[in-house]
Amino acid sequence: MKLALLGDIHGNDRALAAVLDAALEANVDRLLITGDLVGYYFAPAKVLELLSKWVRDVVCGNHEVMLAASRTDPDYLATVETRYGSGVRIAIEQLDLKQLDELCALPHPLELEIDGLRILLCHGSPWDLDHYIYPDLGPELLVRCASGNYDLIVMGHTHYPMLKEIGKTLLVNPGSVGQPRNRKPGACWALFDTESRTIELRRERYDSSDLIRECQLRHPELPYLSEVLQRT
C-alpha cells in the first residue's frame, strides 16, 4: 500500500491541491495527516472538501486546539488573530457545526496498523502535540521518540522535513503542505510504501501568487504570512 504523509496544511488549498494531484499520480491509497488543517490561511472549507475524497487518518494539531478554544472565548480568538492572522476565525465562519465539532474532536496521538506495520501518527511529539521535534534533535530525544516499538512514527508541527532511522523505527516529518519554513518553495509531503518500507520526501511546486496578495491585503500588519511563502 502507498501512503501519503502530510500535514500543517493551514488553510492553503492551492498547496494541498498540488500535493493531492501528485499523490493521485503516485497511486496513493490512503492519507496520514499530522494535523493543523486550519490556521494562518483562508480556505479551510476548500481544504476539507479536497480531503473528503480520500481515505484518511487525521490527528489534532495545535491550531485545532486554538480553534476549539476560540469557539467559546472571543478574547482568546482575538489574541490568536493578532498573532497568527484570521485563519482560525475564518474556519469558524466558513465551516458548519459538524465540521467544526469533528476538527475539535480529533485524537492525539493515533495508533494504526497498516499492512502489518505499527504506525504512530502525531502532531508534535508522541507525548505532546505542541512539542517541537526539529531535524537537529539530539540522540536522547531521538531514542525517546522511537521508544514505543513502532515501525513508523509520523509527526509534524515544525514545518521542517525530517527523516531519521533508529533501530527498526522510521521517524519522519513530511514538512508542511501550506507553510514550509526551510527556504524552499513548494508544498511538502512524503510518500511511503508499506511493502518495501521505502520513504520519499517530496515537494510540489504551485502558484502561490494569489495567496501572497491575499495575505498582503488581509494582514498588512503580519508580513510574515506572505514572506514565508516566498523564502528561498
What are these regions (language model features)?
Residues 92-95, 99, 145, 170-177:
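Short Pro/Gly-enriched beta-strand edge/turn motifs at strand-loop
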Residues 2-97, 104:
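Core catalytic region of metal-dependent phosphoesterases/phosphodiesterases
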Residues 78-82, 115-148, 180:
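Active-site-proximal segments of metal-dependent phosphoesterases and phosphodiesterases across multiple
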Residues 135-164, 169-172:
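Anionic-ligand binding region
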Residues 10-15, 39-42, 63-69, 129, ...:
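Active-site environment of divalent metal-dependent phosphoester hydrolases
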